[in-house]
Amino acid sequence: MLMIRQRTTARPEWDAELELSLEARSKSRLRCFTTAGEDVGLFLERGQPPLADGDFLLADDGRLVRVRARPERLLHVACANAFELTRAAYHLGNRHVALQIGDGWLRLLDDYVLEDMLRQLGARVETVEAPFQPEHGAYGGGHHHSHGGEAEFSYAPKLHQFGVRK
């Protein structure tokens, strides 16, 4: 099994490729296969953004592995004007939908409920097969640089209690 534990910088050549869906690219622990069929174990640092199309990984044996975004069934959304597109993005954001933003269009994973909502908002929606590269959250994935429970990032669990019990 090819073991991969770290990301690395892009290079002009590589030894193997992984073609992964967004869900697979979002995992830090994953068993998968190269495009040539070799068994791979991913053990990446937790709390990092998903792997993106064109990212590079360094295997334990020194091989370079390039990541490709696997084409997925997506909804491609366009609108008559910027206001309508912004309104569609607003409603999708309220539902915490992963969203790829292009020049005059939005893409999201295929979902018939969201497709119906978008059509009701007046959007033009078509189904496409394409790699999915959604925006990352503006506030990151909660990653920090403390180690071993350092006080700066060591927060005690908190139970939220709504109302008073007697």
UniProtKB/Swiss-Prot annotation:
Pfam families: UreE_C, UreE_N
Domain of life: Bacteria
GO cellular component terms attached to this protein's record: cytoplasm
Gene3D superfamilies recorded: Urease metallochaperone UreE, N-terminal domain, UreE, C-terminal domain
One function term, GO molecular function aspect: nickel cation binding
CDD domains hit by this protein: UreE
Biological process terms in GO annotation: protein folding; protein-containing complex assembly; urea metabolic process
Record keywords: Chaperone, Cytoplasm, Nickel
UniProt key word Nuclease: no
Subcellular location: Cytoplasm
Matches recorded under NCBIfam families: PRK13261.1-1, PRK13261.1-5
Family stated for the protein in its record: Belongs to the UreE family.
Function, as annotated: Involved in urease metallocenter assembly. Binds nickel. Probably functions as a nickel donor during metallocenter assembly.
Name by which UniProt lists this protein: Urease accessory protein UreE
Encoding gene per record: ureE
